[in-house]
Amino acid sequence: MKIIEKILSENLSIDNDTFIFDIETTGLNPRFCKIILIGILYNCQDKTIIKQFFAENENDEKELLTNFIEEIYHFKNHITFNGLAFDIGFINYRLKKHNIDFNLNKEDDFDIFKFVKLFKQSLNLKSCSLTSVEKYFGIYREDIINGEKSIKLYENFVKTQDKNIMDIILLHNYEDVYNLSKLINIKDLVKEKLDLLYISNENYNLSIFPVNYKINAKKLTMNYFIFSGEHNNISIYNDNYSIICEDDNISLEININKGIDRENNTILFYSLSKIIPLKFNDQVLEKNIYSLCNFLKKNELHNI
């Protein structure tokens, strides 16, 4: 097993109790596949360090994991890209497989992929892949391979021990963790691209953005992400709707009505000073949905 360490010439803005990590594996299923490379980035004594743990063959996995744990056990938090769905679960399974008494906690993770996915449509992103997100925010990389290509290259490396192949795999992983460090402030980066809604009174000042909604025959639910401001977990209950503020989310639930017009069209609507149609047969009237939700939310929260 090889450990490759590099001290960056720049000191990146990352909390001392937090590290970034990314893994490379021989496949997607941790039951049958192994971890062959873990890259981490962290700050130590005013220096930013990238360290990579590389398995020269698949039998090095346990040693790789042991060295990884020894390096990161004292950190409180971690940052990943799709780590909640892949990296964390994969590592934990392989740790258990090798009887290593350690577990990465998903609650300690900030998953940049999960956050960006909330705003995929609003940002007009075709894909939420790391390379797509990087390009969107003007971050470019040297490496030209993806995870699938990395698997095939590693198979060749194990057979040949060709250093050039190893360097290609290492560069791919290196740029994954390094570029994630450029996305640590992803909330601010996304915030600059959106037309936020602002709600303020003498008690608080919130900046929010609608991320998704659901509508059925009885209820319309709209969720907002809170970019800034404190709200003390506000809860508002009305005969026709409720507003729940919890952590960085505002959930608005509205009771709606269903009717049929003279031409047998099915209409979902809400009655305010006038009837506001929200869905006409299969056509969702998004403009009306957003206007209604924003009006109710802003009106209620502003008056608290």
Protein language model regions, located:
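Short beta-strand scaffold segments in enzyme catalytic cores
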Residues: 38-40
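DEDD superfamily 3′-5′ metal-dependent exonuclease/proofreading module
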Residues: 1-21, 26-33, 43-304
